[in-house]
Amino acid sequence: MKISIASGKGGTGKTLVATSIAASLAPTGRVAIADCDVEEPNSYLFFPDRVLLERKECHVAVPVIEEEKCTHCGRCAEVCAYHALAVLPQTVLLFPELCHGCGACSIICPEKAISESSRSIGEIFLARSPGVELVWGELALGEARTTPLIKAVKERAEGDTV
């Protein structure tokens, strides 16, 4: 079973409700709480006896342009749905905060001048408190892309739990 506490004004008690439900179901031993507020997670603070089990970086794919191979044809910028690339006469500009890591630019490049690298956008944490598994993510300072980190938190929390 999944119970979601979502979409409310800040300070209304979403975290309090979620952690209270988790704590009340803890005796079943099959409770996981996924704090998807990756900009300011705090559900783990309600479980002071937690033990940190895992801390893992979350990465997204980003293009790397090999300038010496690039002919500045502009196909990469044309195919980019998020306008993360701008082709100028002498260079290609990448706006990493706009890039969604789809890889279309590297596929379309006729010169094979675009490869992919990865960039850390934050961390995922896994902890355990008696009867409760806690999963949360912390977005790196200055990072704008919350969606991939939220997705990683949700994937990590999947299982036979409430």
Protein language model features and the residues they cover:
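Switch II (G3) loop of P-loop NTPases
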Residues: 36-38, 110, 136-145, 152-162
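Walker A (P-loop) phosphate-binding motif
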Residues: 1-27
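Short beta-strand-centered segment that lines the nucleotide-binding/catalytic pocket of NTP-utilizing
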Residues: 29-44, 117-123
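P-loop NTPase switch/communication element
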Residues: 39-60, 126-128
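Cysteine-centered iron-sulfur cluster-binding motifs in ferredoxin-type domains/subunits
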Residues: 64-83, 93-113
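Short beta-strand "wing" residues that participate in macromolecule-binding interfaces
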Residues: 87-88, 116-117
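Conserved Radical SAM active-site core
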Residues: 95, 122-134
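Conserved active-site and cofactor/substrate-binding residues in soluble primary-metabolism enzymes
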Residues: 16-17, 38, 71, 75, ...
